[in-house]
């Protein structure tokens, strides 16, 4: 995969705030792994389309699974495919809020379709390219982690690698997604 090697990325995992949403006592990568595990049965339902979206977009399927787990808990937090009070769509929660406050994306496919996963993964790839341009000295793993933060809050909010999650939801988005993706890679073979 040209966009970093998820299993090699250092991560602190979920924040205490994110972990508490699942009744977990403290944050960290163990809590991220536990949340990924909780979502694993639902995630299995999407394995085929996750793998296909990864293949078509040349993105590690484990990264896609990590985003799905964080964004929608593998669909469990969606109402008719919508989340974030109607501002985000699908398993990967693409932002439909008009710019400048949102991504302004028009959803493609149904909320749980291959078309949706390809659209959302292409958005991630676009953020990878923007982060590469913004931070040309970063390595591929750093670009991926920065792009994950940008997927959540836009590339303008990624100011340095040391503070990659400073402006993300829970101040942990990329670290949590990386840890969840690592769990899916190791335990479900994504």
Swiss-Prot record:
Enzyme Commission no: 3.2.1.17
Biased composition (Basic and acidic residues): 1-10
GO biological process terms on file: defense response to Gram-positive bacterium; killing of cells of another organism; peptidoglycan catabolic process
Cellular component, GO, one term: extracellular region
InterPro entries reported for this sequence: Glyco_hydro_23, Lysozyme-like_dom_sf, Transglycosylase_SLT_dom_1
Reaction(s) catalysed (UniProt annotation): Hydrolysis of (1->4)-beta-linkages between N-acetylmuramic acid and N-acetyl-D-glucosamine residues in a peptidoglycan and between N-acetyl-D-glucosamine residues in chitodextrins
Presence of the UniProt keyword Cell cycle in the record: no
Pfam families referenced in this protein's UniProt entry, alphabetically: SLT (PF01464)
Keywords, sorted A to Z: Antimicrobial, Bacteriolytic enzyme, Glycosidase, Hydrolase
Protein name: Lysozyme g
């Amino acid at each position: 995969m040209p966009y970093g090697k998820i299993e090699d990325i250092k991560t602190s995992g979920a924040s205490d705030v994110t972990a508490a949403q699942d009744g977990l006592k403290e944050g960290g990568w163990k809590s991220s792994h536990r949340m990924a595990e909780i979502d694993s049965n639902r995630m299995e339902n999407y394995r085929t389309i996750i793998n296909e979206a990864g293949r078509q977009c040349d993105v590690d399927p484990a990264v896609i699974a990590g985003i799905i787990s964080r964004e929608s808990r593998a669909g469990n937090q969606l109402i008719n495919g919508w989340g974030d009070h109607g501002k985000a769509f699908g398993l990967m929660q693409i932002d439909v809020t008009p710019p400048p406050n949102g991504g302004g994306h028009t959803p493609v496919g149904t909320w749980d379709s291959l078309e949706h996963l390809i659209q959302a993964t292409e958005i991630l790839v676009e953020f990878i390219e923007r982060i590469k341009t913004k931070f040309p000295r970063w390595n591929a793993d750093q670009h991926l982690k920065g792009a994950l933060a940008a997927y959540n809050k836009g590339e303008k909010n990624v100011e340095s690698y040391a503070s990659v999650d400073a402006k993300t939801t829970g101040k942990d988005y990329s670290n949590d997604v990386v840890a969840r993706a690592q769990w899916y890679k190791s335990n479900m073979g994504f």
